[in-house]
């Protein structure tokens, strides 16, 4: 998700249906089903705007038709009480919260306060920065223990704990594993995954295959678009549907396992509200997700 703290990986290609979907205009990939995932927005996308004009910025998001939002650590001038009231007044459901850091120690109390204020039962550790948590197999095993203990703590509080990826979670380690696949196999099944499809593609992987492999363990997907090239180029992001991402294939791969498609921009050099508006319209027009409008 983040380029820096708070200003802030190809497997075999998916064949057939995904490619066919891209060849046909306005193809509703859920045409034979009443089900569609909901469209949400990761608030980090509008971090600069909400710091200076919170209420009107959130109204713009709601007016596009977004069902809900995923929070991050909000600017200091926006209290939990203020944020919660604005979200409620605008009918924006807080379906997920990104933790400021791995929610252990004192960070747990902050996470519980967020959950109470937002009436939200899904907490995601965004995984930033890369650091050494997956560097060696011993580190990985220790990290698994920490994640499992964290998930158990929050489960007792009625909160689901999940993990978010950047590119390194889908790059092979020196000891021969892909971190997120290792975690999927070794973590308690209560831990869910939020797959950032763009960073998976940027890592050189097929995000549709990843989404299929993770199945019900990945109910939330981050949806963003761009060149998906490692380095600074990765941050030259564009509205959903205007880059290299194959979202129909991703939607087919996840099917009804996907609960939320979460639009996100790490960076955008044009008007961010135009970007999130175009992204919303693309998902609606192509029948990939459901919105209010």
Where are the regions that the model predicts?
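Acidic-and-aromatic substrate-binding clefts and catalytic sites of carbohydrate-active enzymes
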Residues: 47-52, 71-81, 100-107, 131-134, ...
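Short, acidic/polar
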Residues: 49-60, 105-114, 206-210
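Acidic/histidine-rich catalytic cores of soluble enzymes
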Residues: 156-244
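Active-site acidic/histidine proton-transfer and metal-coordination neighborhood
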Residues: 16, 68, 76, 93, ...
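N-terminal secretory signal peptides and thylakoid transit peptides that target proteins
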Residues: 1-19, 25
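Conserved, mostly hydrophobic/aromatic
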Residues: 41, 61, 87, 115, ...
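C-terminal segment of N-terminal export signals and the immediately downstream linker at the start
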Residues: 26-52, 60
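Catalytic domains of carbohydrate-active enzymes, especially glycoside hydrolases
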Residues: 57-74, 119
């Amino acid at each position: 998700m983040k380029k820096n703290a708070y200003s802030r990986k190809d497997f075999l290609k998916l064949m057939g249906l995904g490619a066919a979907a891209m060849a046909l205009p306005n193809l509703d990939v859920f045409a034979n089903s009443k089900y569609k995932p909901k469209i949400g927005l990761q608030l980090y996308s509008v971090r600069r705007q909400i710091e200076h004009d919170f209420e009107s910025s959130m109204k713009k998001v709601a007016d596009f038709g977004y069902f809900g939002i995923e929070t991050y650590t909000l600017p200091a001038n926006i209290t939990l009480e203020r944020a919660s009231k604005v979200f409620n007044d605008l009918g924006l459901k807080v379906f997920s919260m990104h933790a400021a850091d791995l929610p252990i120690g004192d960070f747990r109390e902050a996470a519980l306060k967020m959950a109470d204020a937002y009436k939200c039962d899904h907490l995601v550790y965004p995984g930033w920065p890369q650091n050494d948590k997956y560097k060696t197999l011993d580190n990985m095993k220790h990290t698994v223990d920490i994640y499992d203990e964290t998930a158990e703590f929050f489960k007792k509080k009625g909160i689901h704990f999940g993990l978010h990826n950047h590119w390194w979670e889908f790059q092979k380690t020196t000891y021969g594993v892909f971190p997120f696949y290792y975690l999927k196999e070794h973590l308690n099944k209560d831990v869910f995954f939020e797959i950032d499809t763009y960073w998976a593609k940027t890592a050189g992987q097929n995000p549709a295959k990843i989404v299929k492999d993770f199945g019900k363990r990945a109910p939330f997907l981050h949806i963003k678009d761009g060149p998906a090239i490692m380095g600074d180029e990765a941050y030259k992001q564009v509205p959903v549907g205007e880059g290299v991402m194959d979202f129909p294939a991703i939607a087919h791969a996840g099917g009804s396992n996907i609960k939320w498609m979460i639009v996100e921009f790490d960076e955008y050099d044009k008007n961010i509200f135009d970007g999130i508006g175009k992204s919303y319209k693309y998902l609606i027009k192509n029948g990939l997700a459901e919105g209010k409008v």
